[in-house]
Design a protein with these regions (language model features):
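Conserved SAM-binding loop
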Residues: 30, 37-133
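Class I SAM-dependent methyltransferase Rossmann-like catalytic core
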Residues: 1-34
Length: 133
């Protein structure tokens, strides 16, 4: 029961429906931006975006930012860095920033604020999601 609730491969699961809602919200946020949209995904991985692109989503240029160099994947740029310090990127280097269920894992509340400020600095449009506790 719990597995089917959280199974992203089952389109009827709560997890899949929740992911689909997040994508629809993100699509509304980037609707006014020209193609291809330059997206920085802070803490994400390629699987999420492959599913989005396979579903006929808009053309995106995706940069994954992660502490784990193992997130490297064909078709995606990978930057190994900490969300609290995005000094390698200029202001508004991306059209949009996306971060799904990461910020609650970023140190103290002060650290989380630093990460949020950095995401807002590098992209004028951003979506930072965290689970309700």
């Amino acid at each position: 029961m719990v597995w089917s609730f959280a199974d992203n491969s089952d389109p009827r699961s709560w997890a899949s429906r929740s992911r689909a809602r997040r994508i629809r919200l993100f699509e509304r946020l980037i609707a006014h931006l020209p193609d291809p949209v330059r997206v920085l995904d802070v803490g994400g991985g390629p699987r999420f975006w492959r599913e989005y692109l396979r579903g006929g989503g808009r053309p995106l240029q995706i940069t994954l930012l992660n502490l784990d160099p193992g997130q490297r994947a064909e078709g995606f740029d990978l930057v190994v860095a900490d969300a609290r310090d995005l000094h390698m990127f200029d202001d508004a280097a991306f059209d949009a920033c996306f971060s799904n269920s990461l910020i609650e894992h970023v140190g103290t509340f002060y650290d989380q604020q630093r990460a949020a400020r950095e995401m807002a600095r590098v992209a004028p449009v951003y979506m930072v999601q965290t689970p309700h506790r």
